[in-house]
A protein has these predicted regions:
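Short, acidic, Ser/Thr-enriched surface-loop or helix-capping motifs
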Residues: 1
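Compact, glycine-rich, soluble single-domain proteins
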Residues: 11-26
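Active-site- and interface-proximal helix/loop "cap" or "latch" segments in soluble metabolic
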Residues: 24-26, 30-38
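C-terminal binding/interaction regions
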Residues: 36-106
Length: 106
């Protein structure tokens, strides 16, 4: 967050799949509830069936949700398998030509 604080979130599965929430949106919602409004970076750790074979990337809904809280050129998305094995991309790379709050003012 722009404040330097770190917020964590977890994936919450539900028998009614649309009701579940991804860890990214969970963490951001927690941050917003605490007064935060600008994301500078988000780290995502995980993998299918708790496997560390693949990097875990945010789904499309989470990419758009992250986009609502900052400039996609300035938001760093960190994909981590471990403390030493990770990669970084900008949100702009993950969500090119995105629609955001400024789009509503045009």
């Amino acid at each position: 967050m722009d404040s330097g604080k770190i917020y964590s979130g977890t994936n919450v599965e539900n028998a009614s799949y649309p009701v579940g929430i991804c860890a990214e949106r969970n963490a951001i919602s927690h941050a917003v509830a605490c007064g935060e409004r600008k994301i500078i970076a988000i780290a995502i750790v995980g993998g299918a069936n708790y496997s560390h074979n693949d990097f875990c990337a945010p789904c499309g809904m989470c990419r758009q949700f992250i986009r609502e809280f900052g400039n996609p050129k300035e938001i760093t998305v960190i994909f981590a398998k471990s403390v030493t094995e990770f990669k970084e991309m900008s949100l702009e790379e993950l969500l090119p030509e995105s629609f955001g709050p400024a789009s509503l003012k045009q």
